[in-house]
């Protein structure tokens, strides 16, 4: 008799226990999904470090974890710190630098072809729109340029990160770089300097300090 009662109770409790387990599984999966989605956002600035604002088609935007190396991307903010979005793929800074520099050179070539009357290729990357200077006005220090002719007196057009800006021509005693000289492939010259001013030459310092001897500075040309 007792065995029959216990068997009946176990039969009644089994469905109830299964329902409790199913409910717990559903709740834990929902919590995990919510934690993975993160908080809602309007832009990347609303998210914490190593997160970006993901905007799905059928859902509200939310903060998602940044994407690692060689993952698909649409902008730099989607990639984790230390990487950039180049050609829709998260790429290291070292690998991205030569690619971006090559694109800049191609953009400069495209602009030159357009001014000489040759057709511009459609597959060339488009230059970001910039504020046009009034006709005849030369660029001031820090303003964007394409060539030194675009800059005012005492300035030259030199590379600064992934663009070109007007920078001051170097004076006597200022650190300089040999014209056309490039650093190693791991550290390309993305901060170009202007040439030395008139009557000056870029050459190594004459000093007993080995560390300072490696520096090249603008010096007066000695008359023979």
Swiss-Prot record:
Residues 126-136 have a biased composition (Basic residues). Residues 109-139 are annotated as: Disordered. GO terms for molecular function: co-receptor binding; receptor antagonist activity. Its main location: secreted. Expressed in cerebellum, T-cells, esophagus and lung. Appears to be not glycosylated. It holds the Pfam family DIKK1-2-4_C-subdom1. Residues 41-90 are annotated as: DKK-type Cys-1. This is Dickkopf-related protein 4. The lineage of its organism: Eukaryota, Metazoa, Chordata, Craniata, Vertebrata.
